[in-house]
Amino acid sequence: MRDPYHRGVTDDHPLSEAEYWEIYRRVPRLTVEVVVTGADGVLLTRRAIEPCRGMWHLPGGTVRFGERLADAVARVARRELGLTVTESRMLGCIEYPSHWEKGLDCPVGIAFLVTRHSGELEVSAEAEDHGWFRRLPGGMHPEQVRFLVDAGLAEGAGLAEPRPEGAESPGIDRRRMDSGD
C-alpha cells in the first residue's frame, strides 16, 4: 500500500515504488505551499497526519513526476481545500531545516499566492482544523512563520530571531511580488 501522505508514486512513474522511496529518503523533495489570503488573514490548516501532526501550516504537497508547478498548486488546493485555483503567482522558496534536524525528509517548498479561485472552502481529512490568521498561531512550522512575516502577509508570534531592519529573506523575490509577474 502506498503512503497516503506523499502520493508521489503514480502508475506512469519511471521508477518502481521501492526505487522511488530509496531515492526519496536521500534527496530534497520539491513541494508547493498554497498561500490563500482573505479579509481575515492567511488560511492555515492544522495537520491531522504525520509528519508534524497537530502543527498549523500552509496547505502543501509534493510535486509529482512530470507535473508543472501551477498544476501541483491547483491539485493541492483542490484536494486539501476544495478550491479551484484559476490564478496564482510564485512568492518564493521555503527550506525546512527543522525537518532535517528532526531526521525527517528534506522538503524544499515553492510558495504560491493564490490570486484567483472559486469554490467553497472544504478542508480534507488531512487537516483536523483550519483558520484565518492575521497573527500567526503558536505551534506552526517556524520556517513558514518566518516566510509569511517576511512576505508581509501576517504577523509572527514568538519569532526567536527577528531579522535586522531592512534585511531580506533569501527565499523571497520582492521584485516578483512588486511587479505582479
Describe the predicted segments one by one:
Residues V36, L44, V114-R116, W132:
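Conserved hydrophobic "DFG−1" position in protein kinase catalytic cores
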Residues A111, E122-L153, D178:
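NUDIX/MutT-family hydrolases
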Residues G41-E80:
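Conserved Nudix-box catalytic region and its N-terminal flanking loop in Nudix hydrolases
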Residues T84-C93:
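A short coil-to-beta-strand element that immediately follows conserved catalytic motifs
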Residues M1-E33:
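Acidic, metal-coordinating catalytic segment for phosphate/diphosphate chemistry
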Residues I94-E120, G152:
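Active-site-adjacent beta-strand/loop module that shapes the phosphate/pyrophosphate-binding cleft
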Residues F147-D181:
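Charged phosphate-binding loop/patch that engages nucleotide di/tri-phosphates or the phosphate backbone
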